Amino acid sequence: CDEGALRQVSGRLRPAVIVVTNLFRDQLDRYGEVTHTLESIRAGILAAPEATVCLNADCSLTASLAGDVPNPVRFFGLNVPCEATAAGVSDAPRCIRCGGAYQYRYHTYAHLGGFYCPHCGYARPEPDTAVTGLTALRPDGSTARFRCGDDELSADISLPSVYNVCNAAAALCAAGALGLPVRRAAETLGGVRAGFGRMEVLPVGRHEARIILVKNPAGCDRALDY
């Protein structure tokens, strides 16, 4: 669901699960600052109080929603670093609670990672569904280890880049919230295909071209890293 439409439709659709992946400076001409988008998502969640909300523990903005809604909440995220140092692009350098500068125990990408505020104590929550290891990061996909509650498993992911590993964790978190067999859900991750314009591969003569969608500075950083 489009982040701008969630507040309009969630009360009517009455979803069982709402997944919020991350917040970046995306389409500022439509939504303004990321805090405006966050408020819109919060309103959408409040309109569906029976929905279980799956939040990205690595995103300080997304994770903050847990304290603002009465819904049952589950977290997903990466328990392993993906970048040695802080990225040059950060949409959330300061604490959403007190305004202090975040520090990080490790970084995944952009402003995502093991954040904590030394001033007020707001910090990354422990995820219910966690990536505990990255066995392989390939141009065409990856292999990762997951902890889903008490269950440990490994899965192949057919889409490349770290952010798709995070998306896989989100999918497994949602599957668990819906009461689906998580191991069976993990087996399907290797069969996911790219959507139109998102890591789509097109034949160009004797070569292949990959289309990488870029909508914000963080996405551009990931595209250049790829």
Regions found by a protein language model. Give the residues of each.
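Extended interfacial segments that mediate partner engagement and assembly in macromolecular machines
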Residues: G141, G149-E152, D156-Y163, A169
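Residue-level detection of beta-strand-connecting loop/turn positions
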Residues: G32, C148-E152, R206
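Conserved mixed alpha/beta catalytic, RNA-binding, or beta-rich assembly cores of soluble enzyme
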Residues: N216-G219
